[in-house]
């Protein structure tokens, strides 16, 4: 029978150390023992052992000893085919050995090897026989000698530590929180280590099991203590494993239950441990490494806020913005709600709003350039390299009133300056050509109308260098002339005035000068900067002087451009050719455009398959200020858009697709705003005219859409469902049928399939060749859709003189028509003392008991009001009607 309690002195004797030193360590472990006669319980021993393990960096103790066994059996069973099969079954049994109040049998774990002693060197643990032999006796003698040396060293160390203890008594009031100085100064002469306690357990010769390792539990310590006191220990009930059998690990359930280091809980965001216990590595003995070593390499969540640099494109969704800031989309939506915007996770934000949100959330907002493929264009742009620039030909636009001879002047210049044998050999629809003179080359642009010119200037493309303003000498300054002056002044373009029709006898050159001075165009001989040239497109008078003036103005401007570089320019016109596909007329502003180059204009890309000059001949390259017609684009380009030539077609495709996505986002954003406007405008009486517009060229289509959009008012709107270039096809008719739209064809016709569909469906299709006719027709249609003006017209005044109450009829008033007349279907107001008592209509109107349609002034009549009987003698009735008047735009 083992003792369950012993005194401190007995426990120190069993451990082979001085009682005073043991008292010191017990007090450091939080066990309140004052003298060597105090009893030590099993809980006190466990607390002392835990304290010693923690002080030496060992992992936490196991509170139980687990013994795992594996039993192998064989069973015979038939498989699916009926053949017998032998199946090997391995059964693992786990027994947990716990301490009892009066244990009769001490069970020991045999699953672990002994840990090396820290202070006393011990031989390699071996499985010894139950009979004590000579080798065991020699080992005991050696251990007794080493223990006596250890006791001597501990006695000297105790005196030194007690002296320091007295000096630090005030600072060491709380022993549990601050360990004793003896533990802080532990060195080669440390008092008692877990290894020394384990050393005692190795003195049991009768157990036949390996010594308990450094992490042995308190029950094992108790058994070793009893053995040192001379008690004859009993053999464990559990049979020790054979020598060749592998050691068993604790089961998963007991491991989770017994090892505190594995008891993990979900980590909150504020937990700085970073969940390091989840990723702790095991050593070669299957134990977790110490927390101190693991914490050196553990990841910890940053406590300081992380500031991101967010690149924001033109439009970005709420979810994408949250992803760039590494936050949840709900936080971004919350910030936007505080700013007064109700958004969803997929809603698009403009660049300015997104930057405000990023700054509000504490991050750095920057305009996106690194993830924009268009930044590649800035790298390859060498058009501004002044060192490589060479003089170029001027680009001249001829403007003026329609009837002032602008076309005749261009025809004369073209006819006389084109090489011999090619008279009239100019493709007129290109709208651009160049002529050669003795002093240089001049490129003319035939822009039919100021609308296209305004659109080009609005896009920021500097197409025109000089404007020739044509004014008829016999007509003077007209409204379109004034508009052309305003456009040239706004674009800061020099003007050369060509006073045409000087061959007529009624031409007045000075009057033209005076009228233009009133509009800000001052001639040079009057102190201004505009050159005035008198010309005649019929006789050729002054044509050479006009070209000289244009070239002189070009020299003053010092026009230069880079020739040996990728081409860059502007799309003048584009159309869809039935045989050649999308065709674009472009003006090269810098560089050299070659056949086979990859080109990019807006969201359209392609590779030049063919290139024609203004004479319709195929050419291989075009230099600066030369207009050419190119084929090979993916779709019809937008007139006025800038184009650039690239070496890599793949890069052109990437940029075009990026722009298409960007344009789509912007279009959807605008469409969403339009939908919100529609929601707020649903209660208003707004009529909408749906139109599908098809034209021969892109410029005409844009001009027609622009002109029709100007006809909109607050009451009538124009919705252009679709606009495009080319003939009217079946898909256009189907779209018009679905959207209830009117199809307008400008200089184009419907193909055979579309004509059959028009006949069967009855879709309204209108064809026009002149833009003003189309505008007038649409204006009339909009006028018919507008609500007419409603005006009130007073017909007469009636005085009520008698009141008659008739059963089944109601109140009938005998009246006298004072002025005007009273009609049966007219509206009336009942007036009493100048106040309106009732407004309504007549129920009946009689004269001499006969129904009449009207009663004129000076006659009597009887009448009754519909749904109103409160009529009194002396009241007056005002008779009126509503007159509707059609409105005109």
From Swiss-Prot:
**Annotated residues for binding of GTP:** 400-407, 446-450, 500-503
Q: Which GO terms describe its cellular component?
A: cytosol
Places the protein is found: Cytoplasm
Chain residue ranges for the region called G3: 446-449
Keywords of this entry = Cytoplasm, GTP-binding, Initiation factor, Nucleotide-binding, Protein biosynthesis
Span list, region G4: 500-503
User: According to the UniProt record, where is the region G1?
Assistant: 400-407
UniProt xrefs under InterPro entries: DNA-bd_dom_put_sf, EF-G-like_DII, IF2_assoc_dom_bac, IF2_II, IF2_N, P-loop_NTPase, Small_GTP-bd, T_Tr_GTP-bd_dom
Asked if Nucleotide-binding is a keyword of the record, the answer is yes
Segments for region (G2): 425-429
UniProt GO molecular function: GTP binding; GTPase activity; translation initiation factor activity
Where is this chain compositionally biased, Basic and acidic residues type?
A: 238-270
Coarsely, its chief localization is: cytoplasm
Q: What are the residue boundaries of the tr-type G domain, all occurrences included?
A: 391-560
Biased segments, Low complexity type:
209-228
Origin superkingdom: Bacteria
**Family, per entry:** Belongs to the TRAFAC class translation factor GTPase superfamily. Classic translation factor GTPase family. IF-2 subfamily.
The entry's function note states:
One of the essential components for the initiation of protein synthesis. Protects formylmethionyl-tRNA from spontaneous hydrolysis and promotes its binding to the 30S ribosomal subunits. Also involved in the hydrolysis of GTP during the formation of the 70S ribosomal complex.
Which protein are we looking at? Translation initiation factor IF-2
Say which species the protein is native to: Nitrosomonas europaea (strain ATCC 19718 / CIP 103999 / KCTC 2705 / NBRC 14298)
Protein encoded by which gene: infB
